[in-house]
Amino acid sequence: MPKGPKQQPPEPEWIGDGEGTSPADKVVKKGKKDKKTKKTFFEELAVEDKQAGEEEKLQKEKEQQQQQQQQKKKRDTRKGRRKKDVDDDSDERVLMERLKQLSVPASDEEDEVPAPIPRGRKKAKGGNVFEALIQDDSEEEEEEEENRVLKPAKPEKNRINKAVAEEPPGLRSKKGKEEKSKGKAKSKPAAADSEGEEEEEDTAKEKEPPQQGKDRDKKEAEQGSGEEKEEKEGDLKANDPYANLSKKEKKKLKKQMDYERQVESLKAANAAENDFSVSQAEVSSRQAMLENASDIKLEKFSISAHGKELFVNADLYIVAGRRYGLVGPNGKGKTTLLKHIANRALSIPPNIDVLLCEQEVVADETPAVQAVLRADTKRLRLLEEERRLQGQLEQGDDTAAEKLEKVYEELRATGAAAAEAKARRILAGLGFDPEMQNRPTQKFSGGWRMRVSLARALFMEPTLLMLDEPTNHLDLNAVIWLNNYLQGWRKTLLIVSHDQGFLDDVCTDIIHLDTQRLHYYRGNYMTFKKMYQQKQKELLKQYEKQEKKLKELKAGGKSTKQAEKQTKEVLTRKQQKCRRKNQDEESQEPPELLKRPKEYTVRFTFPDPPPLSPPVLGLHGVTFGYEGQKPLFKNLDFGIDMDSRICIVGPNGVGKSTLLLLLTGKLTPTNGEMRKNHRLKIGFFNQQYAEQLHMEETPTEYLQRSFNLPYQDARKCLGRFGLESHAHTIQICKLSGGQKARVVFAELACREPDVLILDEPTNNLDIESIDALGEAINDYKGAVIVVSHDARLITETNCQLWVVEEQGVSQIDGDFDDYKREVLEALGEVMVNRPRD
């Protein structure tokens, strides 16, 4: 056996320990001195404080900085990365000044290296001041604390903690923030101490007596295997950034990551809409198991925009294969919900592909039909692969034949051969004739490019297709085709529309947005309307019963507050009973007293005109065409009476709006004339109604100036057409499209017209307002001429259908269903007669 180092007398080792003795020697030798003299820990600190001088402090700071740099290089090499060097001198000075303020001697204890303890014993956090101040500041420091063993120095730690606790709160919080922001930099001296432990222990081993050296060798052999295991565990934890996090910390981190992902998704999708905030309950274990399900189940999500809460703890349930209509008053968040689903700001199952049709296609040289076909990227990829393999086959590569056969099989499975026919069928249904289908998209207006975008969405057939007011840019013929086409849609559909007839024919379910929640009704819109009215009646009965109970309690001597409290207690007991019955473990909101159900009612009224002798208006021998174009009309000849109810129909571009302008006198015929009663007053609602408004005025000022009305009368007129009171005094330029439309209707009523000529009046109106408009037309005693794509408005007002075709106008024999059948037959479609739920 090799001889151990010569035993050294213990006394000289304590002389000049700051110069010739390593920190490890001091730890071991001071332990012996403690046993002999039995001095307390604080006495030892006092002695050491006197022995340490300013030169020793500077020397140790330099040594500490060198050890820190060595440790940083080793860590960078081990983890395979290099980080930027951080200068910790200022941080150490701050801590040294803090230690001086706390009256804690930091000259020796600061540089002590804890002696290792045998494996299996509990590791005690030692007297390293840096650790005592910044423990648990970072995940990296926690890993280092697990891989090193500290010498017990509990009295010092307690003393420091006590001193910190006695520090003024303001100073402590301020310094705490500084330390927390620099936690990683401050943890490096302690890590450097543990890194240099091996060299210091070798030095101490050489100075030990032979017997102690043997014992130490034995202990190190026992500890070696334990340290290797700990080192492996440390490497595993270093690779796993979440290994040292508690369950609570992991849960918090997951929420933060989900929130950041949602925010980034919204910013990427629409940078202009950065005022939205979204929150959603965590995905339950059952939902996690159903990530590959075809249904959507979102529970307790909230959405706010510009500080206004749109959804609060709402639930979204969408079953695959159902066709949903999302309804509710304007401005309550319907479009916002569709955008959040499309941007995946909410937790949509990853296997569900979602498409929201909201933007028109790019205007370029691409023909309309090719713009639709290029939406199918899978088909394009297979066709490109087919061309490449055919080229290889022609060059004599026999291996390409087998691959080419597989490509053919995939093309047949996706129906690639019928893709162009399908695209042309959709475009034809939306109003594109063969010449228009091959026309570049840059030659179309915005409305027609929006139709191309809708055609692309229908052609792609996503798992969940969302349409926001799809009929707004369509004429009646296109609406009839789309209505019929979507009745055969086999995938999931979510529609926002104000066309009640469209919702009745297409939808199998209705989602009602009310009081920041989503309520579900099975059936079409008509079924929902009946069920909702019944629900409102029941709520009104419950409210009246509650008010009666409150009156009885007040009559019995209870105060209003006491009566309400007692009523709430009764509701709470009922809620708890219902919860136990349904075994609902989730916490529910505390019950509140019922409020009187609010009925959203809108009533349009037009004053009845005086009687006029017929005909009041007509076109006689009229021919008209725009300059440089072929004539739209030839030899028009018809008259209108006071009891006429006429709806002008036909595809886009045949001249429906032009015919209305001829009747109002805004266009002069090329030949012939427009005749009208000299007392006739015409009220005209134009699609571009915003052009006739003065945007800088308020609605009240506009009516007062136009008709010399008193202030209160102007506001009453606006209120009758459903314009909210707060919007009466806002500049017209700041109103929404629906609010501007109501101002125009109020202006029409103030004009007291004898004939109403309405060009697409339902655009930007909600369903309740369209119903009110239909009732107003039925009550009106004057003539009505309307161009509309809303089938229900046409049928509810019993309008005669005049179709514009072949440069003329003719009346249709039959009702609206006959016209629908005629339109579909002309397109080669079969009319779907789906039984309504």
From Swiss-Prot:
GO biological process: positive regulation of translation; translational initiation
UniProt name for this protein: ATP-binding cassette sub-family F member 1
Skewed-composition ranges (Basic and acidic residues): 47-64, 147-159, 204-238, 551-572
Pfam families: ABC_tran
ABC transporter domain: residues covered: 296-540, 617-832
Keywords: Activator, ATP-binding, Cytoplasm, Nucleotide-binding, Nucleus, Phosphoprotein, Repeat
Oligomer status and interactors: Interacts (via N-terminus) with EIF2S1; the interaction is independent of its phosphorylated status. Associates (via both ABC transporter domains) with the ribosomes.
Subcellular locations according to the entry: Cytoplasm; Nucleus, Nucleoplasm; Nucleus envelope
Gene name in the database record: Abcf1
Region span, Disordered: 1-256, 551-599
Ranges of Acidic residues composition bias in the record: 134-146, 194-203
Main location: cytoplasm
GO terms under cellular component: cytoplasm; cytosol; nuclear envelope; nucleoplasm
GO molecular function, one term: translation activator activity
Species this chain originates from: Mus musculus (Mouse)
